Amino acid sequence: MPGILDRVLRIGEGKILRKLNKLKDQINSIEDDFVDLSDAELRALTDEYKQRLKDGEELDDLLPEAFATVREAAKRTLGQRHFDVQLMGGAALHFGNIAEMKTGEGKTLTATLPVYLNALTGKGVHVVTVNDYLARRDAETMGRIYRFLGMEVGVISPEMSPAARRKAYQADITYGTNNEFGFDYLRDNMARSLDNCVQRGHHYAIVDEVDSILIDEARTPLIISGPAEQNSRWYVEFAKIAPRLRRDVDYEVDEKKRTVGITEAGVAKVEDWLGIDNLYESVNTPLISFLHNAIKAKELYRRDRDYIVKDGEVLIVDEFTGRILRGRRYNEGMHQAIEAKEKVKIKEENQTLAKITLQNYFRLYEKLAGMTGTAVTEAAEFQQTYNLGVVPIPTNKPMIREDLRDLVYKTEEAKFQAIVEDIAECHERGQPVLVGTTSVEKSELLSKMLKRRGIPHEVLNAKNHAREAAIVARAGKLGAVTVATNMAGRGTDIMLGGNPDFIAAEELQERGLSPLETPEEYEKAWPEALERAKKEVEAEHQKVVELGGLYVLGTERHESRRIDNQLRGRAGRQGDPGKSRFYLSLGDDLMRLFNGERVQMIMNRLNLPDDQPIEHKMVTKAIQSAQGQLEQQNFEIRKNVLKYDEVLNRQRQVIYAERRKVLEGADLREQVRSMIDDVLDSYVRSATAEGDPEDWDLEHLWTAFSQIFPVSFTADQLIEENGGDISVLTPDIISQRVREDAHEVYDRREAEIGEETMREVERQVILQVMDRKWREHLYEMDYLQEGIGLRAMAQRNPLIEYQREGYDMFQEMLEGIKEESIRFLFNVEVRVNQPQESQITAASAAATASAIPLVAPEAEKTEDKAEDAQEAEESAASAEAAESAKDTAQDKDAESVAKKAQAVVPALGKEEKQPEKLQYSGPSEGGGVEKRTEDTGPDYANTPRNAPCPCGSGKKYKKCHGAPKSRV
């Protein structure tokens, strides 16, 4: 199917390119009209375009003028004019396609065209980058164009407060990483107040390095988790057992799939050592996960490759970028197993609170587009999964880079010796070299060898990535030798002789100028700084060109051809010369796992010495075959992830939509009344499903009713109301009567405490119940998915079984939300203090064990009474009102909700306590899994004085953490 679809997609490319070419000519034809405009006139066009949109004009109609406007603004701010091919790329992005543009063709500048055009709608545009550095850099650099045209620009970064995030999303254009956008979406759907939501919809997004984000990283879901109960002693116990087990005897390892399997012999040994009869008895099944993780930690996770141990802590190293992922942890107890293996302190495990895959997050956008240098090979997957077409954009200048054949050595030692010799030759003649490695370990090994040879070089890996952009920007200078993990520093152009834009920006930064903090001074100083930088690199650029340009040297093939091509693409940008070559050994992971035996056999037959490489078409084909197998395997994994997540995605859409209704308070009273009816009807249906009325257990049914609300009549009274004959009773009669009674009780409660207070109580209660039930459901769905594969042994389709059981569990959860919410709403005690205050008290009026008690916040009991009285006096309209408010303040347990609608319901039981720290797990920049732990401490700094305090006490901020005594 993908093959046929690929051919169909390619047939349409010519038609799209003709359309883009026509638009390009149209933009060029009006360029002079914009050159003659003053800065003020150019800026005024933004308001004109917005008005034309309001008057009914379409975005497509504005495209030529808007693009010409941005082109002229870029010339005046950055000194850069969009090439014709960039105009074509920008149009492709506007129409919701993926623009395939080779490295160095200016994707970042290209994106400014459709970003500006779509930002005119006022709905917000999201620009998605692969890391925080690029998000900040692009927001600053490209932001100069947008700000010149009167647009606001925001950037999202992990350390930002909710208020700062909200402000960034309110901007016309928002830059950030895929993980940050996704996590904000999940957090918004965990928020207890609209004030805590930061995003304002999903209108249009442009994803940079779209193949990396939407394909390579798609199989790793975004997960927000909190601490869960665990027994850490089992990690230690199994860390002792794993070394005693023998590979291929007691267990088997599949390195391709990164899985392990215990054999019968291994099971027998483990049972003997643990003193248990059967490892697979239900009481012992949790131990299987500990065992598997311990073996994985032993066989699949290597120190200094996958992680490092520093200061008694296990820190993950990104497999592809080589960065240390501080605060990130592996899932499913894997990190704890590694900690036990390394004999460091074992940190707590986490429970999933919210979860979504990148595939489903990006499908939320009304319009989606992307940019990359390598997308055509994945065109079918982009079309099937995201409904995105791929448009290959021509290069501005012909590509003349020379890609040399791979050299394969018998041993890794011989390979690295040959690499050092090659680097030494290039360095001696002054040709710059960029060396790509696959791990921190390999980059440090090569660095030591280069030092021994006396070759000066820069190392770019997890231990010095703070300088990576500066190092990469200078990697094209004469004699430069840069050793970098494969993906490090991407997004920064390696220009022969040096990067003048980077040099100019660095100079202004040293002078204390910033495009954000001092925009006017920065713009005034920029032209001169850029001119100086261009003169500095001009002569050196020519010398490097004469030497053959940048030489990219790969020390190992990656599992994806796309990553290899991205590394190669560092050389030969914008028509410059360059060359690339990969050095391999039979010990490389890719060669060892796929087809390495064939190459080994040939080398043995030829009796080649270790330092003699083999260079042949067959080797290239074998490598391509290996990479193809891995790519296909990963594609199947992504498809499988999507199929299973689609089940959860539909459930998530339903629960998030219902949650949003509650959060907004729309028709909340009617929602609660509907819940009451549904729960009571369910009770009646269950009790009257079988037999005649004489057989129904009405006493048991009334007991169930009384656990929900104080029912005011008995079953006997209902029979009397219907002529004293039980046989005339029907389920409808019972339902109708009990509903009316429940509505009357609820209406009385509302009249007692006030409509506004009741709505706030309803909102907080339902949200807390809904969130807890959803968390429990996520846990149960994870547990279901873990074991669903075993259904295949019973000749059942695991996916269909997962869909069926997942649906049943979801329906059960929805019923549970309704029942628990109304039970709480009927039984919570609300005390009304007349005339000024209404509060939710600490007590629960529930008569049954099933009612959920409320616990008053301790902060309220220790409130400074004098401060409360003073605040009450300030807000009183008269002396009498002030005296009344002072009396109220002396005995208050919570903030007024009747006047301000700011009631905050305390946690529904111990388990509802919000965790102090949340953990964020998502795909890393290079396709691995990365985690960070974030303190969920309240955002006090940006809280208005009269808003509820973020600590959750239920009091106003000015009377809680905003009080003078609390301001430190």
Curated annotation (Swiss-Prot):
UniProt-listed Gene3D superfamilies: Helical scaffold and wing domains of SecA, P-loop containing nucleotide triphosphate hydrolases, SecA, preprotein cross-linking domain
Major place of residence: membrane
InterPro entries: Helicase_ATP-bd, Helicase_C-like, P-loop_NTPase, SEC_C_motif, SecA, SecA_CS, SecA_DEAD, SecA_motor_DEAD
Record GO terms (molecular function): ATP binding; metal ion binding; protein-exporting ATPase activity
EC class: translocase
Residues reported in the UniProt entry to bind Zn(2+): C949, C951, C960, H961
Cofactor binding note of this UniProt entry: May bind 1 zinc ion per subunit.
A cellular-component GO term for this protein: plasma membrane
Basic and acidic residues bias locations: 858-868, 883-898
Top-rank taxon: Bacteria
EC number: 7.4.2.8
Keyword Magnesium appears in the UniProt entry: no
Cofactor(s) the protein needs: Zn(2+)
Localization: Cell membrane; Cytoplasm
Membrane topology per record: Peripheral membrane protein
Keywords attached to this entry: ATP-binding, Cell membrane, Cytoplasm, Membrane, Metal-binding, Nucleotide-binding, Protein transport, Translocase, Translocation, Transport, Zinc
Oligomeric form and interacting partners: Monomer and homodimer. Part of the essential Sec protein translocation apparatus which comprises SecA, SecYEG and auxiliary proteins SecDF. Other proteins may also be involved.
Role description: Part of the Sec protein translocase complex. Interacts with the SecYEG preprotein conducting channel. Has a central role in coupling the hydrolysis of ATP to the transfer of proteins into and across the cell membrane, serving as an ATP-driven molecular motor driving the stepwise translocation of polypeptide chains across the membrane.
Name listed for the protein in its UniProt record: Protein translocase subunit SecA 1
Record organism: Thermobifida fusca (strain YX)
